[in-house]
C-alpha cells in the first residue's frame, strides 16, 4: 500500500482529479517489480513516518530527504534524487542570502527539511503550512518574509505567483529516498534492487527527463 502527500510538484500532485508525478511513476515501477498492488492515498507529509511505524502503510514515496533524525524511526532506500533547499522572497526583498533570514518570519512546509533548517536560524519565527502552494501564497500575501522549500517544488510552483524570486545560492544538499518501517529489511532489499535496476536500465533517467527535462 502506498500513500503520498499531495501538492509537491513535480513529485506528487493532482491533475484532472488524478494523483500524478515523479514519485507516483516511481511507486508504480516498484510495485510492478514486486508484483504488488499499488494503492495511492493522500496523506500529510508529517504523518508519513508515524503511519510507517504504525503499520498503516508499507512505503512512503514522497520526496523525503534522508536525515539522521528520520533514520531513527525509518529505514531508507538507496537515494533516487539529489535535492537542494532554496530561499524564496519577494522581488523587492532586502534578504539576499541565508544570513538575511535571522530574526525573520519564515514560511515552510510542515515536517520538511526546510522546516528543520528554518528552526535553526537565530531569532526566526517559523510558520508551518501543510503544502507548498499554501507556503507561497503566504509569501505572496506578505504574511511571511521568506520561505524555504526544496528546489524542484519551488521552481514548479513559483510560476503561479507574481513578484517572487528564488535566491541564487542553495542552502543545503540532500538525498531523496523511499522510507519504510524500521524493521522491514526484506522490503528495503527489494526496493533497493529495483531502484538500482532502474538506474542501470535507463528507466530512472527517463523519469527524470520526463519531469525535470534533465537527469541528475
Task: Please name every model-derived segment.
Residues 47, 64-72, 117, 140, ...:
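A ligand-binding cleft/hinge motif common to bilobed small-molecule-binding domains
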Residues 48-64, 71-84, 166-167:
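Short beta-strand-centered segments that line the small-molecule binding cleft or hinge
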Residues 113-130, 162-170, 195-216:
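Ligand-binding clefts/hinges and TM-proximal coupling segments of bilobed small-molecule sensing domains
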Residues 81-89, 151, 155-196, 212-216:
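Periplasmic-binding protein-like
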Residues 39-50, 93, 110-113, 127-141, ...:
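Short helix-initiation/N-cap motifs at beta->coil->alpha
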Residues 1-63:
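Extracytoplasmic small-molecule ligand-binding "clamshell" domains
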Residues 89-106:
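Flexible hinge/capping segments at coil-to-helix
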Amino acid at each position: 500500500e502506498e500513500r503520498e502527500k499531495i501538492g509537491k510538484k513535480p513529485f506528487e500532485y493532482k491533475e484532472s482529479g488524478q494523483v500524478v508525478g515523479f514519485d507516483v511513476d516511481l511507486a508504480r515501477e516498484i510495485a510492478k517489480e514486486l508484483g504488488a498492488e499499488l494503492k495511492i492515498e493522500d496523506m500529510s507529509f508529517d504523518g508519513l513516518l508515524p503511519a510507517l511505524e504504525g503499520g498503516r502503510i508499507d512505503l512512503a514515496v514522497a520526496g523525503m530527504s534522508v536525515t539522521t533524525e528520520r533514520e531513527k524511526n525509518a529505514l531508507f532506500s538507496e537515494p533516487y534524487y539529489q535535492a537542494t533547499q532554496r530561499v524564496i522572497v519577494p522581488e523587492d526583498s532586502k534578504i539576499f542570502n541565508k544570513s538575511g533570514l535571522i530574526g525573520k518570519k519564515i514560511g515552510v512546509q510542515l515536517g520538511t527539511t526546510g522546516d528543520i533548517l528554518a528552526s535553526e536560524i537565530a531569532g526566526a519565527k517559523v510558520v508551518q503550512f501543510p503544502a507548498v502552494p499554501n507556503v507561497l501564497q503566504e509569501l505572496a500575501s506578505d504574511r511571511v518574509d521568506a520561505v524555504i522549500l526544496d528546489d524542484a517544488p519551488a521552481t514548479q510552483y513559483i510560476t503561479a505567483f507574481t513578484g517572487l524570486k528564488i535566491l541564487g545560492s542553495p542552502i543545503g544538499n540532500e538525498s531523496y529516498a523511499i522510507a519504510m518501517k524500521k524493521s522491514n529489511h526484506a522490503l528495503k532489499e527489494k526496493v533497493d534492487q529495483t531502484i538500482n535496476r532502474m538506474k542501470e536500465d535507463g528507466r530512472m533517467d527517463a523519469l527524470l527527463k520526463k519531469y525535470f527535462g534533465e537527469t541528475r
